[in-house]
Regions:
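Serine-esterase "nucleophile elbow" of acetyl-processing enzymes
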Residues: 1-69, 219
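Structural motif
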Residues: 67-79
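Histidine-bearing beta->alpha loop at or near hydrolase active sites
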Residues: 65-70, 207-211
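Short, glycine/acidic-rich beta->alpha junctions
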Residues: 44, 73, 138
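Alpha-helical cap/lid subdomain in secreted, periplasmic
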Residues: 2, 77-233
């Protein structure tokens, strides 16, 4: 994990900024670099990245955004590099979402479509699944190499859905993955595939959406802290 003297950056989607936990009371302060009207009803100070970095006494910044895609995280990284100098020993954590449901493509009419349309033919959906893997791998390669080129140590994990990479073009090193692509943080926190069961839903999820409640965020943080301690990253 990032040293106390270095800076830790957290990139991610709504899970990383405490979506559904109520409007921020300002406790995140200048640490939350992506605070805007789109991120209403979010309490990043109660989300797992803040809990982890606060527990480890780290200097950190939050760059999460609701609905963020892997590709948008790359754009967010580029924005950060354009706007801020890179401090020594900076570590960047990229908390990846579901790469299939967060996939944009242009259809034959020139319209931008997000995700797989439910009424598409089977062969189209199968092709899009393959395209998602390629696009995600290319985007992660870019994030990885851009971090290294700018003196940033990249760290990757999947928050709530495992991902598949195209291994023939994957350029990332094994040590950059805090959690392997075949696993995800929610499985470590709640049990494999258990975030959707009734008990977990009632205890650890917001009643109105699929986001973790405050206790659920605490479990995510504990699972990640344990993983960090075991892997010494």
């Amino acid at each position: 994990m990032g040293s106390q003297d270095g800076l830790v950056l957290w990139f991610g989607d709504s899970w990383t900024i405490g979506d559904g936990l109520g409007k921020s009371n300002g406790d995140a302060g200048t640490k939350w670099l992506t605070n805007c009207h789109w991120n209403r009803n979010c309490r990043p100070e109660l989300a797992f990245p803040s809990i982890v970095s606060s527990t480890l006494s780290e200097n950190y910044r939050l760059l999460g955004n609701r609905g963020e895609t892997i590709q948008q995280m790359g754009c967010r990284l580029k924005w950060y590099l354009d706007e801020f100098p890179v401090e020594e020993e900076t570590v960047a954590y990229f908390c990846f979402p579901n790469y299939k449901g967060r996939y944009y493509y242009i259809d034959n009419r020139g319209n931008e479509v997000r995700g797989n349309p439910g009424n598409a033919p089977k062969h189209v959906i199968e092709w899009q699944d393959v395209a998602c893997k390629w696009d995600a791998t290319i985007a992660i390669n870019w994030i990885y190499n851009t971090c290294l080129a700018n003196g940033i140590t990249p760290r990757f994990l999947q928050t709530w859905r495992k991902i598949e990479l195209v291994e023939s073009i994957n350029q990332t090193s094994g040590e950059s993955w805090v959690i392997p692509p075949s696993e995800c943080l929610s499985d470590l926190a709640f049990g494999k595939g258990e975030f959707g069961n009734q008990y977990v839903r009632c205890r650890y999820r917001n009643t109105h959406d699929n986001h973790p409640n405050q206790e659920g965020q605490r479990r995510l943080a504990d699972a990640l802290l344990e993983t960090i301690a075991i892997n010494n990253v």
